[in-house]
């Protein structure tokens, strides 16, 4: 975030609309008088809105103001959770024990709030029987139904079968679809 406010002597306008440190309107004053008031208060004169005529300036502690802005920005970045797509790769003839391990791995990804891309890779003549891959992917997505929902149905893409499971429930998916439909209608 660019913090490029003009302060004190950087302000070049002959007259400014002044706002006091408590937020009260002090009226339109000459820049010299506004700087004197700020100096008497032991604070800075900061140009808040340069677009208006005359520019709006406020008496405040500029260091404290800048610190507050950067702190707000950091807090808002912390609050955001970036959803990542994690991938779990399977084979159509996977053993039961290996399958349960992959299912546990996928569950931890979904519980942490990430989407899971389930990929069933076919080798050689395994592609002649894609229904085996569909069964494995279906079983995996059913194992994740209580904590997530199928966002993209299983489909064949080259030599692999791909399905995406997102965190949440089917109810949240329906709410998202309704909000998208309302956005498109407006």
Swiss-Prot record:
What does the UniProt keyword field contain? Cytoplasm, Initiation factor, Protein biosynthesis
Broad class of where this protein is predominantly found:
cytoplasm
The answer to whether keyword tRNA processing applies is no
Query: Which branch of life, at top level?
Result: Bacteria
Q: Which PANTHER family match?
A: TRANSLATION INITIATION FACTOR IF-3, TRANSLATION INITIATION FACTOR IF-3, MITOCHONDRIAL
Its subunit composition reads: Monomer.
Q: What is this protein called?
A: Translation initiation factor IF-3
Whose protein is this, by species? Chlamydia pneumoniae
Q: What is the lineage of its organism?
A: Bacteria, Pseudomonadati, Chlamydiota, Chlamydiia, Chlamydiales
Q: Gene encoding it?
A: infC
